[in-house]
Amino acid sequence: NTEAAYDALSNGMKTLLANRRARHEINESVATVHPVIRTHPVTGRKSIYVNDIFTRGIVNLPPDESDAILPFLKRHVQRPDFTYRHTWDEGDVVIWDNRCTQHYAINDFEGRRVVHRVGFFAEPFAE
């Protein structure tokens, strides 16, 4: 829950991150910049938008400062109190809002399973 993770930041950290942008890279030729803090277009709640896989650095910060803050944020959003772990049973349906969550699939299910993924398109983030 990246909204709860944002809410738990100190006011000083929230101020430091306000209007900051981070570089996200899939590889050297595919990169973009996103706000570190995003606002949900429906609820208006703020959330942290960094992740272990793609977020490489906070732009317009000295590298040593970015290198200190970014790992903190990545660990912070993964804290157990912001995490939901589902134990699957037959017939389960799980729905989440990708605008304020991060997800990671764990292969902890023995046997065959069928997964259907559905995407809904909504308003873009207010940036």
List each language-model region with its residue ranges.
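Non-heme Fe(II) oxygenase catalytic core, chiefly the N-lobe of the double-stranded beta-helix
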Residues: 1-93, 98-127
